[in-house]
Amino acid sequence: SSALLLYFNPEITITRGNKVPEDFEGIIFDIGRGKYDHHQRDSRIRENGIPYAAFGLLWEELGTEILGEELAAKFDESFIQPLDINDNTGEKNELATLIGNFNPSWDVENGENEAFSRAVQTAGMILVNMFEKYKGNERAEKRVEEILAAHNSSVLSGEKSESEAKILVFPEFVPCQKQLRETDIAFIIFPSNRGGYCIQPLKKEHSLNYLSLIHI
């Protein structure tokens, strides 16, 4: 939650505590029985039955401004919700365990604030990488749609033969396996960063694509 708020506004100051000061003005989360505190009997639950934690409540408020409505919903489902489940139930989550390992040992005096700062910094880097990954995937989907549309047009016009119809050539590498899985494309070709070209079969759920190639 702290990492998300700092991503949204790096100028804010995060203050830790178990009680909200009477004169406090700012965003309060995880305590205080307010909008972003899930430690309440009437705490909110998603339509799919997954309860919100503070992270999810803050993401609901800020996520669309970071990723847009569609991507924010996908990010909530795949990234936020598993962490909210962990926060609410203790169900194992590798990322939550990673961040939790920043907590100092039980017999170490003080050091909690420093450990918290390192944990937030690490969580912040993870968030930045995840945001960029989701944005990149969205750009890839649009690029694949463009290339596939041009390919299908060439097939319909007769410019490409029946055998060529199942081979999609990319002018550059674009992540596409998942997007093309339900199409008739069997192989993709794209430039290799080592020179020449790479040929990959499409990974179909119930079949394998094989092609004998001449060894050069």
Pin down the residues of each PLM region.
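Glycine/small-residue-rich interface belts in oligomeric ring/scaffold proteins
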Residues: 2-72
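A broadly conserved detector of short glycine/acidic/proline-rich loop/turn motifs that flank catalytic sites
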Residues: 33, 40, 174, 193, ...
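Gly/Ser/Thr-rich active-site loops/lids in small-molecule metabolic enzymes
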Residues: 185-192, 208-210
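A structured phosphate/pyrophosphate-recognition subdomain
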Residues: 49-178, 190-194
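A C-terminal functional module that forms or caps the active site or interfaces directly
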Residues: 200-212
